[in-house]
A protein has these predicted regions:
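Local beta-strand N-terminus motif with an aromatic residue
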Residues: 5, 53, 72-73, 112
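N-terminal Rossmann NAD(P)H-binding glycine-rich loop of SDR-like oxidoreductase domains
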Residues: 8-28
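SDR active-site strand-loop-helix element
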Residues: 11, 36, 76-80, 115-121
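Short glycine-/acidic-enriched loop or helix-start segments at secondary-structure transitions
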Residues: 19-21, 44-45, 87-88, 126-128
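A short helix->loop->beta-strand "cap" motif at the edges of active sites that frequently abuts
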Residues: 30-31, 110-114
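Glycine-rich phosphate-binding loop and adjoining beta1-alpha1-beta2 segment
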Residues: 34-62
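NAD(P)H-binding glycine-rich loop region in Rossmannoid oxidoreductase-like domains
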Residues: 59-96, 125
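Catalytic helix-loop patch of NAD(P)-dependent Rossmann-fold dehydrogenases
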Residues: 95, 99, 103, 110, ...
């Protein structure tokens, strides 16, 4: 059971969805957040403005960091993935969306940490059919 002192990891924390999750968690009183992302973009910096958290960890450093620091993590929201449907480099998708997600899952499984994983691009694709969750159009949606 989570309480306000629980430590929560949010991957993709500087992106649109991840930063909204950080805002939501802050509003619920959670501030012991470990933010994981690639923090090299000024727009992402704006997404984190006024957010409360413990530390930011670069995505590629995260597993070395947890091995070294051994934080007591109570929950992981894995929202970090390459969702850009115009990215055609398969190796990037393979690394970020498959291999990295598997490493997150393994980390959580080994350490008995609850995990929530979500990605919207697989449903909405480039958005040519809109961004509706109406069940009538679900069959037409694809990445």
């Amino acid at each position: 059971m989570l309480n306000k002192d629980s430590t929560i990891v949010v991957t993709g924390a500087a992106g649109f969805i991840g930063s909204c999750m950080v805002s939501y968690l802050n509003r619920q009183g959670f501030e012991n957040l470990i933010l994981v992302d690639e923090f090299d973009d000024d727009e992402k910096e704006l997404n984190l403005l006024h957010k409360k958290y413990l530390v930011r960890v670069e995505r590629e450093d995260f597993f070395d960091w947890v091995q070294r620091e051994k934080p007591a993590v109570h929950f992981v929201f894995h929202l970090g993935a390459r969702t850009d449907t115009t990215e055609f480099d398969y190796a990037i998708h393979q690394h970020l969306n498959v291999e990295y997600s598997q490493k997150i899952w393994n980390y959580c499984t080994i350490n008995n940490i609850p995990l929530v994983y979500a990605s919207s691009a697989a449903t909405y694709g480039e958005g040519e059919l809109g961004y509706h969750d109406d069940h009538e159009i679900i069959e037409q949606l694809h990445p």
